[in-house]
A protein has these predicted regions:
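Non-catalytic tandem-repeat scaffold regions and their flanking low-complexity/translocation tails
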Residues: 1-205
Length: 205
């Protein structure tokens, strides 16, 4: 359909195209797209057994359809959820999607538009995925408070070890000593010298 003159891409032509090949949705003019047409494209590709049909969300401008795809993905292929979320257009992503995604995969915090990144959502993200949620960048430093790193420490051993050196505060180190005493014992270098040598919540406990 990409070789058809834009003027000739009527609703009928577009529907026939996506019924034959769901990925033709990419060539449908934005003003011709409807929720029904987008669902038809998804249905076509799913019918072919195409495991990547959810990637069509990159061509879907409707919140409700993208949300349907996310819910279906959660039920049938939860391991693909992050990849599908990445493909959703930033202007389509909204608070409802953010609050759906973060308890399932905290890494999604880094792909949210900045206006959707809030302290509460960062909290949920690190409770879900620890440092994996915020260690890849994409989250404003102003939201990465000391409490966020304490939550990362509490998440898991793996998350604890990913905490940047500069963020290993007395509170983080105390959490490590409390939850994973063997790490602190066997890897004393985990605790910065500045924390070991000062009177703090870490040294006084």
């Amino acid at each position: 359909m990409e070789f058809i003159c834009r003027h000739d891409r009527t609703a009928e032509v577009c529907r026939a195209a996506v019924e034959e090949d769901g990925w033709q949705l990419e060539n449908v003019p934005e003003e011709m797209k409807t929720p029904e047409l987008c669902r038809k494209a998804l249905e076509t590709e799913a019918g072919f057994g195409n495991d990547f049909h959810r990637g069509l969300v990159q061509h879907i401008p409707f919140v409700e359809v993208c949300m349907e795809v996310l819910k279906e993905c959660r039920e049938n292929n939860p391991e693909e959820l992050y990849g599908v979320a990445v493909a959703i257009r930033p202007e389509v992503m909204n608070g409802e999607m953010a609050d759906f995604l973060l308890p399932l995969d905290g890494r999604c915090i880094s792909i949210l538009p900045v206006h959707l990144q809030t302290p509460e959502r960062v909290r949920v993200a690190v409770e879900t995925s620890g440092m994996s949620a915020v260690g890849r960048g994409g989250v404003p430093k102003s939201l990465l408070t000391p409490d966020v790193y304490v939550s990362c420490a509490a998440h898991s051993r793996e998350s604890l070890m990913m905490i940047p050196w500069a963020e290993r505060s007395p509170e983080v180190c105390l959490m490590a000593k409390t939850l994973y005493p063997d790490i602190v014992k066997n890897h004393p270098e985990f605790v910065p010298e500045s924390v070991r040598n000062q009177d703090s919540i870490y040294t006084l406990n």
